[in-house]
Amino acid sequence: MPGPPRSLEMGLLTFRDVAIEFSLEEWQHLDIAQQNLYRNVMLENYRNLAFLGIAVSKPDLITCLEQGKEPWNMKRHEMVDEPPGMCPHFAQDLWPEQGMEDSFQKAILRRYGKYGHENLQLRKGCKSVDEYKVNKEGYNGLNQCFTTAQSKVFQCDKYLKVFYKFLNSNRPKIRHTEKKSFKCKKRVKLFCMLSHKTQHKSIYHREKSYKCKECGKTFNWSSTLTNHRKIYTEEKPYKCEEYNKSPKQLSTLTTHEIIHAGEKLYKCEECGEAFNRSSNLTTHKIIHTGEKPYKCEECGKAFIWSSTLTEHKKIHTRKKPYKCEECGKAFIWSSTLTRHKRMHTGEKPYKCEECGKAFSQSSTLTTHKIIHTGEKRYKCLECGKAFKQLSTLTTHKIIHVGEKLYKCEECGKGFNRSSNLTTHKIIHTGEKPYKCEECGKAFIWSSTLTKHKRIHTREKPYKCEECGKAFIWSSTLTRHKRMHTGEKPYKCEECGKSFSQSSTLTTHKIIHTGEKPYKCEECGKAFNWSSTLTKHKIIHTEEKPYKCEKCGKAFKQSSILTNHKRIHTGEKPYKCEECGKSFNRSSTFTKHKVIHTGVKPYKCEECGKAFFWSSTLTKHKRIHTGEQPYKWEKFGKAFNRSSHLTTDKITHWREILQV
């Protein structure tokens, strides 16, 4: 049998000693994460050798790996032929599966078989370090395991590192059966291998000789400096095939690819929630303890994580170090600037797989996804109402408390939402920074300008699936849909009457208070609502701005014109499901529905007679009071109903025509 190669006799370690090749068949048995880990380990080994001054020239294998090529297609003569010094106490449970072990055995035996198999078998019988008497004689015992030459110990350690990391790449935690026997005197830290101890000690003895020219920061290892430099060069050599994202480090790419695989290896024992990163699980666990060890000295607010406290402190300093080069706006946090920049670029990197809609923020996508599931998991214990988002439930709860925490310093008005207060404050400044290029009209908010622009473009993106009618705004479509469903979510606590719109409920509530804050300066008449006053004012001007293009008839109110147009079109959009009768006005339809219920809620206190509609009760009461509000001043006549006045006028004109 030939003796060991010269390099091992001399105690020198070369890159050939720590390189492993794979055949095409073996390489294809590895998944992407394992292939990437192989690349990472081989490149790291080469950098370590380069640091020690052992690697003089760059091997072709390293060039191949750096370029992202497959290592199995390397020429045979370019690969190495020296056998490694294998560590015999390779614990049995380090092998994840038999097939993987066989692949490694084949790869090693194929290369080093000529040196004899007895030194190459991966010995799995070692259940503990005691079997190999590693602890019996300390350093000497360990050398029996690794070989006597220090270079071989280093070499064995490197090989162990390759296999150890490779075989456990799919495990959340690495387990090792050996006792950690060797203690560093400077720190109570235990190691399984002597080479680890040697490497650990070098942290104390080695000067930080690798210095960054850009910022002056120094490092122990050249590999750390190389990774650090990527911050300035923006070099991102590793690209994800699934999503066009390029991390700066291969390990980051491996972690990133787990996201696409959907694999969540790290599970919380407390609540069962799973994560694809161990760091995320560690962070999550603190939630269950409720501990908030990081306290702000300025305001006393406590936080779970130190990073959150650091970010919070910026609020007190009012420093805004992150500035937008496009518009000059500054922000406290870099993440806010990143999101802000997307407003300028129009970038929407977060796409919904269900409908294809894209968003500029991941949180908005998360919120959007709930639309497809329809899940409402956040329930109010007070009234039983459920919500899709926790923030909406939190906001809703304030309704029950009636508390308005957010107060305007300018006018003292209170709000139950901070966003409402922020919106309100702009009213006091009078600033309208968002201007329409088409008509010059300015707006307080950009969202209002966006909606306004649709008037010029005549774009109606929101379409009703029920009847096909399209609308400029989503809110209008939402209200329109209630016409089909009959939903009336806004209920009056005073009388129990329900409404399809919140504004209608607000308007209705004034009836109970009797308040009439809107007064006509012309005649002194007061009204419950500003819209009614606006309509009333037209009486004094006799202005009829709303004209029918079909017949030329003019009206004082746009709503009356809308109802009038249906006479020409014959449209009757309001259909009764009970009897099938259709109506061209919603008010007429509402009155009609009461007939089917048989309920007559409006009762006369004078005689006890009941009516379907309040208007009929009002007319009836005039019988008891004798009130006659409809007057014909020309003849001194008065009537208790407008229809009676109209009938009398017609009779009068007929008499004149007959004469």
From Swiss-Prot:
C2H2-type zinc finger segments: 210-232, 238-260, 266-288, 294-316, 322-344, 350-372, 378-400, 406-428, 434-456, 462-484, 490-512, 518-540, 546-568, 574-596, 602-624
Any coiled-coil regions, as ranges: none
Localization in the cell: Nucleus
InterPro entries assigned: Ikaros_C2H2-ZF, KRAB, KRAB_dom_sf, Znf_C2H2_sf, Znf_C2H2_type
Residue ranges annotated for the KRAB domain, each copy included: 13-84
One GO BP: regulation of transcription by RNA polymerase II
One Pfam family hit: KRAB
Record carries keyword Manganese: no
Function summary: May be involved in transcriptional regulation.
Protein family per UniProt: Belongs to the krueppel C2H2-type zinc-finger protein family.
Protein name: Zinc finger protein 254
Species: Homo sapiens (Human)
Encoding gene (name): ZNF254
